[in-house]
Amino acid sequence: MASIFSKLLTGRNASLLFATMGTSVLTTGYLLNRQKVCAEVREQPRLFPPSADYPDLRKHNNCMAECLTPAIYAKLRNKVTPNGYTLDQCIQTGVDNPGHPFIKTVGMVAGDEESYEVFADLFDPVIKLRHNGYDPRVMKHTTDLDASKITQGQFDEHYVLSSRVRTGRSIRGLSLPPACTRAERREVENVAITALEGLKGDLAGRYYKLSEMTEQDQQRLIDDHFLFDKPVSPLLTCAGMARDWPDARGIWHNYDKTFLIWINEEDHTRVISMEKGGNMKRVFERFCRGLKEVERLIQERGWEFMWNERLGYILTCPSNLGTGLRAGVHVRIPKLSKDPRFSKILENLRLQKRGTGGVDTAAVADVYDISNIDRIGRSEVELVQIVIDGVNYLVDCEKKLERGQDIKVPPPLPQFGKK
């Protein structure tokens, strides 16, 4: 049986204890990592057998529902992460939300970094299903933030109206948004804004707390695609990510509004580089430079991001594991978007489309949000290059259709590891 002292030195307890003692949190993170590998997973006895608790998923259409079997549920139901997160908490959002008519949702979230290990028997097959066959049990993820490798990164701005790259980062030693306490959420905010104050040059900016904004200011930023929406999505609310809203939430942006950090929405942080026009290479260069600088500043203050070789960067939703990267453009393609081959072209190019305002919105004036569908198994450079090559292909198709010429469905891109 674990001693009282070893229990004290797990999860959030250790972070708070060492912070109180003035110990470097980087050292704390190292100690927590060692414990995480060695600590026994706690069991939480239940009154009823697993079969009595198994959720009714017969009408569900999400990755969790497809992968969760009675046997897996029975094996994992009583397990608890060092921070106290359970399997039922992981899957609740997928139980409450059966599915999406057009997009197959994941249906589960992680409450902490350890969730992906303690409940790996479910997370691993869900990750494999969601990520085009990426198997975290046998594969490793690579990271590459060298923007100089990008080619053909300038789009035709008659068609491409804006360009954007985003990712997420989680701070090791603190629970993720579905499970974090108020104190942890406020600590995330404090760690982030203290580090961001060190940004210089074109990255320098300021932080705006959501609780200090007027409703009008919030809506203006949302309409301009600078700020996250209010937490009305059932996927967020059922996962517990809207608790205490808007406490410790906010947005940091540079003075040009081309480099932004969202704090405490779905993830601890979301890092975004964006601008009008079609210069994706410049957007990605700023993204890489800013992200590296943010990580350096956070590490200087004794913290680090969650990362491992199996899963890459750890984020709340399994759909964002690996790079967490979504590179997208707003592109006007009135003729191609009406062509019956459009969906197949996107599928083969490993791209996805959304409406002008994002998920669940319509395309206004034939403008679509086109982005990469994959997150893990390919590096950041590879994913951005896929978007660049793919969007250039879409624009070329649009030009051919304007001239009355035929277009072709491209061959499907090879999966990772088959280059």
From Swiss-Prot:
Cited Gene3D superfamilies: ATP:guanido phosphotransferase, N-terminal domain, Glutamine synthetase/guanido kinase, catalytic domain
Entry-annotated residues carrying Phosphotyrosine: Y255
Keywords on record: ATP-binding, Kinase, Membrane, Mitochondrion, Mitochondrion inner membrane, Nucleotide-binding, Phosphoprotein, Transferase, Transit peptide
Phosphothreonine found at: T356
SUPFAM superfamilies reported in the protein's UniProt record: Glutamine synthetase/guanido kinase, Guanido kinase N-terminal domain
GO molecular function term, any single one: creatine kinase activity
CDD domains (UniProt xref): creatine_kinase_like
Subcellular location: Mitochondrion inner membrane
Expression sites (tissue/organ): Sarcomere-specific. Found only in heart and skeletal muscles.
Membrane topology value: Peripheral membrane protein
EC number per UniProt: 2.7.3.2
Catalyses which reaction(s): creatine + ATP = N-phosphocreatine + ADP + H(+)
Residue ranges of the region described as Cardiolipin-binding: 40-64
Cross-referenced PANTHER family: ARGININE OR CREATINE KINASE, CREATINE KINASE S-TYPE, MITOCHONDRIAL
Additional note from the record: Mitochondrial creatine kinase binds cardiolipin.
UniProt protein name: Creatine kinase S-type, mitochondrial
Gene name of this polypeptide: CKMT2
